């Protein structure tokens, strides 16, 4: 009986997943030791020693729980008393219908919450291997797992981790943006958490400027990665220049789409493309370039991005960069409670399991924490229904194979939460014959959301 021995649960990695897992376990009255290698050892992307540091965007994406899958996941996490969502809500900044946060305030809130919890001990040390006398362990080291621990994980799992490139976008000082050219507006004037409908700074481009910009992206000098040349990108975080290579019009229909925006300086002139900047901190002194993750050389970033109208004199607080992410072939090696089949005392959580995104990583950390707590109390974990966002995401990780028709081989890819992961629903009761396609699609999503929230509430109530 592990609980009678009063042994703590060990969590390796103080990112989003590890922080959330620690909180969930401690809130259930179980001691936790959280191991974090920073500041003893920094990764190639981290800049601070704070827990739950956001290394890429400051956005948790849409907070619309009625029609958006990630917004639904937000809602379920709030129901489960998530620390990550509590910290995000406390540090939100204007971002239209999205939930974006002051990244420093957010990580500070998480760090202080964990440091002040009487059942959580934080050890600042790098873990090179997993001690045999640790009987209940969650590995939440994320996509930037240190080489030594990655090797230890590979040795235990008996399989090579898969990898892909991930990139981060530049951040600009607000006072260096030319507001005689740019203007404040959220797409379609949407008002979200902490927002006003004027939460983004917009930079307009005409057709000639846009095409010149695309060519500059293609021609710009990129950082070369000899060691990782054959590692693919994750489609949800493609470098801007890679998107430009896919076609001249790609960016106009992606992060630079002009729809739903009107230039307040010249309202009768429709922009051909628009670059959006999103507030990055509560003070409003920093804005990040939405969708502009890049592997361009630093000097090229400054030169090319200053050709964007309104950014001619832009000063950069941080330039974009690129790092390697790793994830496991989870459906092969993990069971339904995220335990390693070969070594059940080990459980994995977060992005290393093959989920993609801040919220998804935190959600899997939440589940892993609750599963580990149940095991500590000698009960089999109660799985979230597959009809919930929690359950849909967990099911993808533990059984989300894609069979390729060409080779008939099983393939597992990182995935954001989306409605395609949910079981089908009979939405005829929510639809009328007179509805158009978009209306029927909306009604179906709302039916999925209603079912998910009801099932999630019942599941959580059953855990009490």
UniProtKB/Swiss-Prot annotation:
Instruction: List keywords of the entry alphabetically.
Output: Cytoplasm, FAD, Flavoprotein, Methyltransferase, NAD, NADP, Transferase, tRNA processing
Q: What is its main location?
A: cytoplasm
GO molecular function annotation: flavin adenine dinucleotide binding; tRNA (uracil(54)-C5)-methyltransferase activity, 5,10-methylenetetrahydrofolate-dependent
Q: Which GO terms describe its cellular component?
A: cytosol
The record, for Pfam families, names: GIDA
Residues making up the signal peptide according to the UniProt record: none
Protein family: Belongs to the MnmG family. TrmFO subfamily.
Which cofactor does this sequence's record say it needs?
Answer: FAD
**Disulfide-bond pairs as recorded:** none
Q: Where does FAD bind?
A: 13-18
Record's function text:
Catalyzes the folate-dependent formation of 5-methyl-uridine at position 54 (M-5-U54) in all tRNAs.
Query: Could you tell me which HAMAP family the record lists for this protein?
Result: TrmFO (MF_01037)
At the top level of its lineage, which domain of life is listed? Bacteria
The protein depicted here goes by the name: Methylenetetrahydrofolate--tRNA-(uracil-5-)-methyltransferase TrmFO
NCBIfam families registered for this protein in UniProt: gid_trmFO, PRK05335.1
Query: Might you give the EC number(s) for this enzyme?
Result: 2.1.1.74
User: Where found?
Assistant: Cytoplasm
Which reaction(s) does its UniProt entry say it catalyses?
A: uridine(54) in tRNA + (6R)-5,10-methylene-5,6,7,8-tetrahydrofolate + NADH + H(+) = 5-methyluridine(54) in tRNA + (6S)-5,6,7,8-tetrahydrofolate + NAD(+); uridine(54) in tRNA + (6R)-5,10-methylene-5,6,7,8-tetrahydrofolate + NADPH + H(+) = 5-methyluridine(54) in tRNA + (6S)-5,6,7,8-tetrahydrofolate + NADP(+)
Q: Does the keyword Transmembrane apply?
A: no
Record keyword Cell division present = no
